[in-house]
């Protein structure tokens, strides 16, 4: 079964071809980071217009890359939500229109399920069940994953996501968009112990997170420095901030594995690309004889490959339904069912 995947939930246009027998055949991505950088964040209208320009050319590109044509497709998967309404509508409209013209089935994929399953695209993927850390600009969640569509929420952020805290800290430090990579690069120049920030809910006894207080603590620290906030001070704050976030995430992940009795952790989402987080998780897991699985770096952020894969996994068991142009900008992962 050959599935075309379309991702257009925010500021990346991702296309991919996944074959259930041969695996990932081709993928392509256009990022809008440069376009939105001048505004310090994503402008929804600009994002939608750019998806319109990019989706069909990228579709042709992945088909050529794989030596396939539209006639070879067995189905089309697209991101139905959550995300920006206009951006989702672009991908949905193109997917459903193509499918209607080719008489193909479609499946709307939950964006977060795509992220959750992205590590399964890698060689030697983990077997079910496992614990998943989904950590991005919009979500910070721990889940027990027993099968595709069988997700138990173990812990969630009570306020802001880790990725949002990275972006806010980047703005406070005068760094460029997107904030996560910029903070990480600056943190490499920081010195341990030069300043202190709290570790929110580190010892809360549950698996929930909170990062709003950490953002406030960074703001307070920046204001305390005032005119003395030079490059050295900024690097030290970035270092301490990254240490705080990664320490909390690592401890909660180890607790989730211990509480569930599982020994496999997968990490997905944009913050999952953070090198310091990977280092801490790998060290902590090695001490406890756990295994940690990550998607390749390019699949940590939004991409078409994860949508093609998730769609293929569900489409193998799904009945063909009526074509629908409905998008779900807000969509709880708990609402998903097994295929």
UniProtKB/Swiss-Prot annotation:
SUPFAM superfamilies: Actin-like ATPase domain. It catalyses: L-threonylcarbamoyladenylate + adenosine(37) in tRNA = N(6)-L-threonylcarbamoyladenosine(37) in tRNA + AMP + H(+). Its EC number is 2.3.1.234. GO terms for cellular component: cytoplasm. Its cofactor is Fe(2+). Substrate binds at residues 134-138, 167, 180, 274. Its main location: cytoplasm. GO terms for molecular function: iron ion binding; N(6)-L-threonylcarbamoyladenine synthase activity. It is found in: Cytoplasm. InterPro entries: ATPase_NBD (IPR043129), Gcp-like_dom (IPR000905), KAE1/TsaD (IPR017861), TsaD (IPR022450). Keywords: Acyltransferase, Cytoplasm, Iron, Metal-binding, Transferase, tRNA processing. GO terms for biological process: tRNA threonylcarbamoyladenosine modification. Required for the formation of a threonylcarbamoyl group on adenosine at position 37 (t(6)A37) in tRNAs that read codons beginning with adenine. Is involved in the transfer of the threonylcarbamoyl moiety of threonylcarbamoyl-AMP (TC-AMP) to the N6 group of A37, together with TsaE and TsaB. TsaD likely plays a direct catalytic role in this reaction. Belongs to the KAE1 / TsaD family. PANTHER family: TRNA N6-ADENOSINE THREONYLCARBAMOYLTRANSFERASE, TRNA N6-ADENOSINE THREONYLCARBAMOYLTRANSFERASE, MITOCHONDRIAL. This is tRNA N6-adenosine threonylcarbamoyltransferase. It comes from Methylobacillus flagellatus (strain ATCC 51484 / DSM 6875 / VKM B-1610 / KT). The gene is tsaD.
């Amino acid at each position: 079964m050959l599935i075309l995947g379309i991702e257009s939930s925010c500021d990346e246009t991702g296309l991919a071809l996944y074959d259930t027998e041969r695996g990932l055949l081709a993928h392509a991505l256009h990022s809008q980071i440069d376009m939105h950088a001048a505004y310090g964040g994503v402008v929804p209208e600009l994002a939608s217009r750019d998806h319109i320009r990019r989706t069909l050319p990228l579709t042709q590109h992945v088909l050529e890359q794989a030596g396939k044509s539209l006639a070879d497709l067995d189905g089309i998967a697209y991101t139905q939500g959550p995300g920006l309404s206009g951006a989702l509508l672009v991908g949905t409209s193109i997917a459903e229109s193509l499918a209607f013209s080719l008489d193909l089935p479609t499946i709307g994929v939950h964006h977060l399920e795509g992220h959750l399953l992205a590590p399964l695209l890698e060689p030697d993927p983990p077997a079910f069940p496992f614990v998943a850390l989904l950590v991005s600009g919009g979500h910070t969640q721990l889940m027990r994953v027993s099968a595709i569509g069988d997700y138990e929420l173990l812990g969630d952020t009570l306020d802001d996501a880790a990725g949002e805290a990275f972006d806010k800290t980047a703005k406070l430090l005068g760094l460029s968009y997107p904030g996560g990579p910029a903070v990480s690069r600056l943190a490499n120049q920081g010195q341990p112990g030069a300043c202190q920030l709290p570790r929110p809910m580190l010892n809360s006894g549950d698996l929930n997170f909170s990062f709003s207080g950490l953002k406030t603590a960074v703001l307070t620290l920046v204001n305390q420095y005032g005119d003395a906030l030079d490059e050295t001070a900024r690097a030290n704050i970035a270092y301490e901030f990254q240490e705080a976030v990664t320490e909390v995430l690592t401890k909660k992940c180890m607790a989730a594995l211990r509480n569930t009795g599982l020994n496999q952790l997968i990490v997905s989402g944009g913050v999952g690309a953070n090198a310091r987080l990977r280092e801490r998780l790998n060290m902590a897991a090695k001490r406890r004889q756990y295994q940690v699985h990550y998607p390749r770096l390019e699949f940590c952020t939004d991409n078409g490959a994860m949508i093609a894969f998730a769609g293929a996994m569900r489409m193998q068991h799904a009945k063909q339904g009526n074509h629908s142009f409905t998008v779900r900008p807000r969509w709880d992962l708990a609402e998903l069912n097994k295929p």
